Swiss-Prot record:
Gene Ontology CC terms, in alphabetical order: apical plasma membrane; axonemal microtubule; ciliary basal body; cilium
Similarity comment: family membership: Belongs to the Flattop family.
GO BP annotations listed: cilium organization
UniProt source species: Salmo salar
InterPro entries: Fltp
Annotated region (Disordered), positions in chain: 97-187
Pfam families, per the entry: CFAP126 (PF22611)
Function, as annotated: Microtubule inner protein (MIP) part of the dynein-decorated doublet microtubules (DMTs) in cilia axoneme. Acts as a regulator of cilium basal body docking and positioning in mono- and multiciliated cells. Regulates basal body docking and cilia formation in multiciliated lung cells. Regulates kinocilium positioning and stereocilia bundle morphogenesis in the inner ear.
Domain of life: Eukaryota
Protein name, entry field: Protein Flattop
Length: 187
């Protein structure tokens, strides 16, 4: 289909002969001329360097470190507490502090912390639970449960818990105590 068209059919339409200023446009060759000299072969047909050709010394990746060049102790992961719940941040902090690795936390902004009831500022508070209540590293509570039932993990579970309480209270109410609109009529 394209055998009847030349390769430069569109090119000539965009070659401006008048640049709308006083400079003369520079015309380049349509096809470049051949390079001077000849190509020197440095490798055989099998891809090996020919004798007499100097091989380049040094590595192409000078900064690469293999497994054996890595340090014996890798630096610990840093925890970014942004967009985490307080309980999730404490769990991560606890896991890293008790796993034998150090911990680095990022602070997004410096806030003015009001002193807590025990005199500590909000930023100075740490997990002061007795060691018997702390889970051993690696033993995390099952998703949806928080340790020993202290409080739910998310706001959604708090909402669900409050809804179940209201439904159970409604069931406990007698039929006479409920208003006329809320009564369920037996069918």
């Amino acid at each position: 289909m394209s055998s009847g068209y030349s390769a430069n059919q569109y090119e000539n339409a965009f070659n401006s002969q008048k640049l709308q200023n006083w400079t003369v446009p520079k015309h380049f060759k349509e096809r470049p001329s051949a390079a001077q000299g000849h190509t020197i072969f440095i490798a055989s047909d099998r891809g090996h360097l020919l004798p007499g050709v100097k091989a380049k010394r040094g590595s192409a990746w000078p900064d690469f470190k293999g497994t054996w060049e890595l340090p014996a102790h890798l630096p610990p992961a840093s925890i970014n507490p942004t967009a985490r719940s307080e309980e999730g941040r404490q769990r991560l902090t606890h896991t890293y502090t008790h796993s034998g690795h150090g911990i680095h936390t990022h602070r997004a902004a410096k806030t003015t912390a009001a002193p807590a009831a025990d005199g500590q500022t909000e930023g100075d508070q740490t997990c002061n639970a007795p060691t018997s209540e702390r889970p051993v590293t690696g033993e995390r509570p099952v998703t949806g449960q928080s340790g020993r039932g202290e409080r739910p993990l998310t706001q959604a579970s708090e909402r669900e818990q409050s809804l179940t309480l209201t439904y159970s209270k409604r069931r406990e109410q007698s039929l006479e105590e409920t208003p006329q609109l809320e009564r369920e009529e037996p069918q």
